[in-house]
Amino acid sequence: MERPRHQGMTKNTYMRWRLPLICLLWEVAMIILFGVFVHFGPEADAHWEEEKREMNLTSDIENDFYFRYPSFQDVHVMIFVGFGFLMTFLKRYGFGAVGFNFLLAAFGIQWALLMQGWFHSFQNGKILIGVENLINADFCVGSVCVAFGAILGKTSPVQLLIMTLFQVTLFAVNEYILLNLLHVKDAGGSMTIHTFGAYFGLTVTRFLYRPNLEQSKDKEGSVYHSDLFAMIGTLYLWMYWPSFNSAISEHGDAQHRAAINTYCSLAACVLTTMAFSSMLQKKGKLDMVHIQNATLAGGVAVGTSAEMMLTPYGSLIVGFICGIVSTVGYVYLTPILESKLHIQDTCGIHNLHGMPGLIGGIVGAITAAAATEDVYGKEGFIKAFDFTGSYKTRTPSIQGGFQAAGIVVSLLMAFAGGTLVGAILKLPIWGDPADENCFEDDIYWEVPEDEESDVYHMHNPDKAASP
């Protein structure tokens, strides 16, 4: 006999037709669009041998694959393992955290290859893709994973897929405006990935505000083993963040510099986070929420300026500041956002991605405005900011102004896009869980028998107590 489901469930969360239909329809659409538009780039095409002769290359080692693929591997692990496991801290939402992150990322990278391809690598009616396109698609999906953190445990998989469709589209537009029209530098995505993703997600979760979410408060916390799983995600993200911030930088000194700056900022951020986590607790004990999240803020904040001459000590300062800002945000700001602004931020993305992303954009603007030929050298100065062609007359101060404008554009795109998507997801047709069933795997997943029994008894205490 099938076990009775949770009492009090007032919403239809039945996914048997909704989820398969949208997944299959969208995958068929991807197959058709890829068939029409997508082709291998020159360095992935079988005509590479002719390309080598034309470019006077003697070895396959000059193929961009061998420069970019190690970084791509690291970024790929961050998206699917790092972000996925970071969100497993919820005691009863481990399947949803990893599984839905897997789902939206797998769909998102396909749509991102198309959207970014139409903007950046569309030639003669075809999108030409190579390993750098794969990295950029992962970056785009990283922004979606950030937004997912704000609504974790409160949405259906169908809502997540719809959000991914819109967010990837808006990300590609925002990225094109910043990188191509404003000509800003944002190698590690402080503005395009973190600022946009965080404030997009926060706007969406504001529209999806649940006044009775207190009914699920008992499941919103963590247990010992769920925090350990989340810490696995933290460590993967922390270790690979230098690759993330340097993955698409120019070969040579820029990529080298980006990795060093990120490395230093992350290290400083850990010590500051530990210090303030202890300082802000009455008994001086460390809070695992801070260690899992705030320790990564240094990587976020150094993203825009990573390939600039920020210097190692400058990176340490950025990491130091972000450790403080992020930890203080978790302690004081997150409760205020929920009680005063009705922003229910499950993972605290405002503290890990939002504020550090803004700091990163500001640091990038200041570093660009302060750049001189004495520091960079004449050729290095031109190369670092790509002051060529129509931008050859641009000065550091003007570049700094455009960098600051990039922050504003990202925020406007995030708020406008989040408002649109939040309004769509608010419609009562997507199978989202009832307030009392949020943060619960059992709504959308088959869970092991003993776990399911625990959930049933938790919602039916009278029967649990009966002999």
Swiss-Prot record:
Cellular compartments annotated: Apical cell membrane
InterPro entries in UniProt: Ammonium/urea_transptr, NH4_transpt_AmtB-like_dom, RhesusRHD
Transmembrane listed as a keyword: yes
Ranges of the Extracellular topological domain: 42-69, 116-132, 181-186, 249-259, 315, 373-404
Regions that span the bilayer: 21-41, 70-90, 95-115, 133-153, 160-180, 187-209, 228-248, 260-280, 294-314, 316-336, 352-372, 405-425
Topology of the protein relative to the lipid bilayer: Multi-pass membrane protein
Glycosylation sites: 56
GO cellular component term, pick one: basolateral plasma membrane
Entry keyword set: Ammonia transport, Cell membrane, Glycoprotein, Membrane, Transmembrane, Transmembrane helix, Transport
SUPFAM superfamilies for the chain: Ammonium transporter
GO molecular function: ammonium channel activity; ankyrin binding; carbon dioxide transmembrane transporter activity; identical protein binding
Chain ranges on the Cytoplasmic side, renumbered to this chain: 1-20, 91-94, 154-159, 210-227, 281-293, 337-351, 426-467
Positions in coiled-coil regions: none
Disulfide topology: none
GO biological process: ammonium homeostasis; ammonium transmembrane transport; intracellular monoatomic ion homeostasis; regulation of pH; transepithelial ammonium transport
Subunit structure: Homotrimer.
Role, per record: Functions as an ammonia transporter.
Family (UniProt): Belongs to the ammonium transporter (TC 2.A.49) family. Rh subfamily.
UniProt-recorded name of the protein: Ammonium transporter Rh type C
Origin organism lineage: Eukaryota, Metazoa, Chordata, Craniata, Vertebrata
Gene responsible for this protein: RHCG
